Amino acid sequence: LLASSAASDVYKRQNPNYIEQFLRCYTFGTISGTYPGSLNSRGLCAPLEPGWEQNITQHFGGMYSGSPHKGMDIGMPEGTPVYAAADGKVTVANASDSWGYSWGYYVKINHAEGVDTLYAHLSSVAVSYGQYVHQGDVIGYVGSTGNSSGNHLHFELYLENNRVDPYPYIGTDLLSKYLERTF
């Protein structure tokens, strides 16, 4: 918890518009016409409601069972809604294999060319393969399926099929800047 609080303080200092950026991501609702091929101007938003930062239990890159952790774990009660971080198309909606490559029940969404997010250890999945979702749509619910030691959301961000730390991209325009530079 102390490391999480310190990381949050550093993030806030590096992003003077933190509150504005954070709050705009919680204006949920339908965002028109941004998929396929682009993210809307709000960028990547948190997959959980406000307060999630205090519940980070494992950061990206930390050691877990002898290897680097490839996502961010956020401890939340079972059944907490999980939201799409951006508009996109569901490319995986695993609701039948509770082991699911150790992710348990999970959802993967393609948001733009080369940008994907993954939401794992869900208690249930609320979307289907091929479905288009909008930022803020409920896609599943926090659980503890797969290789999990308790209820939490395992959240991953992929850029060009490489897992990267999602934390700096949440509520900022970093992803838009990355896409401008890359494409």
Write out the residue ranges for each language-model feature.
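Short peripheral tails and domain-boundary helices/loops at the edges of structured domains
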Residues: 116, 120, 158-178
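Sec-exported extracytoplasmic/periplasmic mature domains
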Residues: 23-31, 138, 144, 171-175
